[in-house]
Amino acid sequence: HDDKIGKGRFSTAIRKGQKNRRLAFDVDSKETIIMQFKDILLNNKSIYGSELVRVNIAQLLYDLQKYFDGFSVYTSAQFNTRKMREPVTIKNLDDFLNYDAGNFTNVFNRYTSEDMLWRSLFEDRMKELIPNLKMIDAATAYDMLIFRMLYSSGEQYDLSDVSEGTLKGLILNMLINMPMNRERALLAIDEPETNLHPAWQKVVGNWIQTAGTFKQCFISTHSPDFLDVFTEEFIHGNVAVFVFRDKEKIKKITYADIAEDLGDWELGDLYR
């Protein structure tokens, strides 16, 4: 990149002694080069005219883009539950949950339309959190789409009536059990425990450890209760714990490092 925001530069010389030519282009400072490289090529004749850029560098960046396409990163603080509670215009274009989860109902409707088995799985997962839940559904009313929940008592609620914890459970259920044509490389969620009862945190932790929709899951948490559920897999080496402290290097903790201190305790006990 250049020293000015919105400008990019790179050299074409890749071997010692080779004549160098610096190519410059405009970039979107809020997006990575990988995601906008195709547009950069098409909008800059001088860059597209370089075989090195058009073939070698482009292929490398496309390979990187394909890899990072498998990354799903979400932050609990950005979930907009107020927006999620509102009826939505029916759309079938949303493949993934937005960063703010505002398109939850449309994504749910699309997934259930494409795969009835996924709907059954999603419903069963929610019943682990809410045992008296009988059925969930997305229904139309006045050309708007509404997500509804039916309880064993016969009471029905839409998302405007349920608690913040219930909304959070719905979001995490979708993220962790999202149907994919191919396995995701990484699912990252910042503080998934927010607004969740400790008992629900354990359920969500089990979802993460048993889901087959991603190769790795990265969780940042301040909750000892949430950590507890990962104790057994941590002992077996299937869960890694990293400690972040200001002005210190990130430290990975293994079971061997703390076996004596942990004893018969659970992971969360180290932070209580």
Write out the residue ranges for each language-model feature.
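Switch/communication elements of ASCE P-loop NTPase nucleotide-binding domains
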Residues: 125, 135-272
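Electropositive, glycine-dotted interaction segments
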Residues: 1-124, 128, 134
